[in-house]
Amino acid sequence: MEDHKLSLYDNIAKVNAVDPELYERYPVKRGLRNSDGSGVIAGVTNISNVHGYLMNEGDKVPDEGKLTFRGYSIYDLVGGDATKRRGFEEIVYLLLMGELPTSSQLDALVEALDAQRNLPDGFTASKIMSTPSHNIMNLLQRSVLMLYADDPKAEERSFEHEISTAISLISRLPRIMVLAHYAKRAAFYNESMIMHRFIPGQSTSETILSMLRPNREFTPEEARMLDIMMSLHAEHGGGNNSTFTCRVLSSADTDPYAAYAAAIGSLKGSKHGGANHKVLAMQKEIKENVKNWEDEDEVASYIAKIVNKQAYDHTGLIYGMGHAVYTLSDPRAVICKDFATRLAKGTEFEAELNLLKLIERLSPEVILQEKGTKKDMCANVDMYSGFVYSMMGIPQDMITPLFACSRMAGWAAHRFEELVSGKRIIRPAYKTGVKAREYKPIEER
């Protein structure tokens, strides 16, 4: 029996290998990408735009990155105001409603979020504490599906219900995330289970920090930094994997809980939202192996080892550098680095931040030197986001879940747009590479 099992495992790679030549023959847009790396146009959206290059007579020309939500620049939306408390909520309103809120409209949204923050009776005990998960993303995904059972109108497709469901999940996911973290620590690491009640009137970022920290204390600067991070991650176009996943399921006319749970599953992937863990692990290795973080030659030497597949995970990739769209700059990384610089100045984190800036500056030079090719690459938001979260004492296993809590607003906006304007189920085609075969009875095989 064991030999039979092994033969099944051995055949998996062989049976599922598609001849690479077939991708060229048909031709296939692998990963829904064109040959120049740009995405295949699969739809039109009024929600956001991600700009990273220009096209000149068919050639990609690098350009400074731009990110707009409903036509507004992310630089203007986030701004430089260090005292702003509800930037994320303002962006949530903009994404869902299409316009920037007035003061009274923003207050109404905040009240709606507060009203939905509590979980259904018994949910925490039966759905979180009694069934903890080693991975918070899995528990988030499971919880979204379980909230379906507590919604008597779960299959209703009215706009009122869609908006109500979206606001409910935007409000509840942060609470589920923090509870899932403590349930995990209690179940698998024998730590105390901490459950703070939320404080009405707090912003989303304040609520997260207040529920996460045992003493509930945080500074206005920390709350503002988390607010900025959530704003930067709230939306990033319709073509990213999790948002497209949400649109695909929405085009099939499934319920909102199923669509959002699928998006969370996509975001968990190491090639999407989970990529930040690779960045943090690589940065940790560099910090441990480079003695003088200010020595450019020593830092460049270790980056060269990574590029030449002699260090870290031996893939030759410098995680945190490069992006599918952005070429000269990622506006999210620019903003993140700017606010991180302010927060780290004069603290024990300043030297580490300077090292990250050095990695960002040296990486293109090292690649050119080692590979002989000049790449238009910039730091992406993951280069600095993990560092920012570490400054705030946010555990690493909460980074991708925080991403999900932030992106929930973007997923909802795209689901709304798909329901109104999509009209057709998303159904691309697949060519077959298998020729017709003659069926033989089992005794003749």
Question: What are these model-predicted stretches?
Answer:
Residues 1-445:
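Non-transmembrane, aqueous-exposed alpha-helical and coiled segments at domain scale
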